Amino acid sequence: MSKTRVYELAQQMGIENKELMSRLKAIGVEVSNHMAAIDDADIKKLTAPATVKEVSQEEVRVKPTLIRRRAKVVETVAEEAPEEVAVEAPPVKVVEAEIEKPEPVVVAAVEVAKPAPEEVVKVERVEEPQPEKPTANRARILGRMEIPGLKPKERPPVQREAQRPAVAPSRAPERPAAKPGTERPASQRYPDRPAPPRGTERPSTSRVPERVTPIVPLAVPPVGEERRKGRKGKEVAAGNGKKGAAGVVVPKRKEEFKKTDLLEKHERIFEPGPRGKGKKRHVEKVSVGKKTEITVPKAIKRIIKISETITVGELAKRMGIKATDLIRALMKMGVMATINHPLDVDTATLLATEFGYEIENVALDIDEILESAPDALESLVKRPPVVTIMGHVDHGKTSLLDAIREANVIAGEAGGITQHIGAYDVELNGRKITFLDTPGHEAFTAMRARGAKVTDIVILVVAADDGVMPQTREAVNHSKAAGVPIIVAVNKIDKPEAKPERVKQELMELGLVSEEWGGDTIFVEVSAKKRINLPSLLEMVLLQADVLELKANPEKAARGTIVEAKLDKGRGPVATVLVQEGTLKVGDYFVAGVHFGRVRAMQNDRGDKVLSAGPSMPAEVIGFTGVPDAGDVFVALADEKQAKEIASLRQQKLRETELAKHTKLSLEQLYEKIQMGEVKDLNVIVKGDVQGSVEAVAESLRKLSTDAIRLNVIHASVGAITETDVNLATASNAIILGFNVRPEVKAQALAEKEGVDVRLYNIIYDAVDDIKKAMEGLLEPTLREKFLGRAEIRETFSVPKHGTVAGSYVLDGKMVRNAQVRLLRDNVVVYEGKMASLRRFKDDVKDVATGYECGISLENYNDIKVGDIIEAFEIEKIATKL
């Protein structure tokens, strides 16, 4: 005997578990909870009355007891007055007015009108064994389902029943008993909703035709579904041949409903899940939820605006999905992320596309803001040429510039090398020329490259007594790459060993052919020391400038390049700016690299204060928030807010770049490094007097890195060596290099206390050489085997406490006591270890030379045989060179 659980039966009937448990209790079946099992017999008891009720959806209110009692009367009414019902249909309006008040009257009418002859027979046949039980049971259940909110739905049934005013009086005495039933059937219809399929039995539905006419005019929205049930019954009745105008008119309408709405009802209600109006409503709600999830938002709502980066959680929130879905999608892409993981624009775009969204980057477009608008031809005016002096170390670049400026700046140079770029103004015959002085050492390649980019003309200084050198070639290459015309100044022609013709010959190999030899390169032979041909050199510069037609717009916002930057103790960050277009004024806001500021003061190359700087004019600017890098583009902006925003964005990008460089090794990478050999690191902190020198030293040190040892410049800045630098060196086990700077007193004391190595230099050669030596000291020494000698075993002796002793003859070299030895048997190594003792006759000896016999014992090894060969060797440690 199969059993069904309470909750399963409740789902099938389309009612709540509690309601079903109440019904079961009413028929005498005790259940403890919704998981309790019910026998089929109990289920039949429970569902038997429902079957009778569901046969006619409209007339649920009729009690089986009444039907049985009035069976004969009903037959009489149904047969005698079918026509009267149709005739009395018009008075419906009168009854409708009374619907609200006398509910009992309505019920009485229903009870009388409902029973049909066939229905009575069916009821008696099915339910005669226990007639009273279903009635009582139904009364209780309906009582439990009373819901005040459903009162409005009682109106349609009342209106239909009102069509039989003649029958109502006969049931008047029973009103009190029917009163509760009047309200309950309205609420009871929800679970009884699925009746249509079962209602297909013609016998049970034959009683409905009398109410066809009243139903049509009703237009109460909440009861739309209930009216459809009534129509279904009427249609069947009409088919059975019932008479009356109502029965004739409705069949067509009922036929349409049966083919369309009824099929839809099957799809919507029966297929998705449990039956019942209540359940149907629940199913509809669920389906609406699903549609909401699948629904694609409008195109404008599918665009998510982000600025540079966005976290996983924020992106999920804006797309209206769970963060776990995004994390799962990232994992499929090979990215392990958390809810707070930042996503760049590209990654966010990939994710959003997968979920049907678009990403719009609303970050500030720095390039667009800083882009310079083209100038009108009428706004352009002539500007002075910017001339860069380039050449090899100590070929006289600074001497030449000194001679031109008539100022002695050479005394401030260490080792004959210009330590940083200087920018100067020179006036000749009322026309100005701006000079940039670049260092000659190869470490300053980047600075020379920057100098070539901002310059109009390059003066290549070559010593007549030295000729073309490596830095000379680099200068030529930089100038050609920048497309800058070159004027060659052959310096030091006053020296007896000067050979200007040789210089021309060597430069011709580099593609610089003198005009005298049919080329287009201007050569001027000068002497900076004796001031020979200097005016001629300047005239050639101005002539070349005229050919280039150099022009700029002085009326626009200033734009230029940071030539040099340093941290001044009294003035803070100071930078030399070469204005290339526009005019820079005191009070202007600006941005340069990751720093911004406001021009608080400006000085020219002579130290005089100036209020403005036009095109091609160098000026020392005070007002930076930090020390910018040499070569950064300097742009004047309208307000501080914009400058600050651009600087902060650049700082963020710089941080991301730095983090990408210093990523931690994964376990797999670490294992690979261990397999390949341990990599050693040397950490260095560089401090200097000017930014250009710091950059040059740092770049030179980075070039010393090899596969075996890695040099990391963990910090490089301008200014004196401070306690912060020492603390950083302590934490990272670094060496501090000071270039033209000294440590503070407290920093010096802290360095001595912590044991931090602080090196101070004035010339870059010394710094590079010392670091190179330090790196060599970090490398493991190379182990090399040195052969000492070979001896043949000719006899073996067993000596107490010493084991087996080999009587040997030295074949070549010498056998040395305590040396490393190998024992070879048929040229196969059978032992490698240390010599325990070496004796000649009975005396211990230091060594035994070729051609002599000796006794040799091996450490912890006695398996010695005649004919074996003993090789002696030692391991030498050789320092590794970079």
From Swiss-Prot:
Region (G2) residue spans: 416-420
Keywords per UniProt: Cytoplasm, GTP-binding, Initiation factor, Nucleotide-binding, Protein biosynthesis
Pfam families in the record: EF-G_D2, GTP_EFTU, GTP_EFTU_D2, IF-2, IF2_N
Residues at which GTP binds: 391-398, 437-441, 491-494
Start and end residues of each stretch annotated as G4: 491-494
UniProt subcellular location: Cytoplasm
Major subcellular site: cytoplasm
Domain tr-type G: 382-551
Signal peptide span: none
Basic and acidic residues bias: start-end ranges: 151-163
Superkingdom, natural source: Bacteria
Biased composition annotated in UniProt, kind: Low complexity: 236-246
Region (G1) residue spans: 391-398
Family (UniProt): Belongs to the TRAFAC class translation factor GTPase superfamily. Classic translation factor GTPase family. IF-2 subfamily.
Protein name: Translation initiation factor IF-2
Species assigned in the record: Geotalea uraniireducens (strain Rf4)
